[in-house]
Amino acid sequence: MRTASIQRDTRETQIKLSLNLDGAGKADIATGCGFLDHMLELFARHGDFDLSVTCRGDTQVDYHHSVEDVGICLGKAFQEALGDKRGIVRYGQFLLPMDETLVLCACDLSGRDYLGWAVDLPAAKVGDFDTELAKEFWLGFVRNCPGSIHIRQLAGENTHHILEAVFKGMGRTLKEAVSLDPGHAGEIPSTKGLL
């Protein structure tokens, strides 16, 4: 089974996260930030990942540390669950429409971290969530599960819809990238022989 459990304790956050890449989209999320919980539930459902997250953070300050650190832990969990990445497809992409919004997500689980973020969020907040933290989440993820991730908004006016499309699209994208390639079972998907 391709699973991982991560625990991270700092002065700012205490996080427990478990991930099953070959799950059924079951989510049990309690980060202390309702909007992040919603996004992670969508991510898990659309990626068919079983994901459990609990986070106690310094939310009396704001959600920055909690959001970034959950992204870090999710990246670490993907990296651990993938191991040497033997047999995976490696690449994934998805074009996700949601009402007026259209978001393109693509990734290469190459071992080299890069985030291409071309997302224009009209509102600074959705509820009490600072929308700029979505980028911090994905930066935390890609720095701990190194790969190239590109997230590009092609259309959209409603900030909630845009962010929802990002998290759903990344769930679908990573589902494809981590899926097992039956034509190359047991092979590292690189001419270099490692990722």
Predicted segments, located by residue:
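Structural preference for solvent-exposed beta-strand-turn elements
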Residues: 1-195
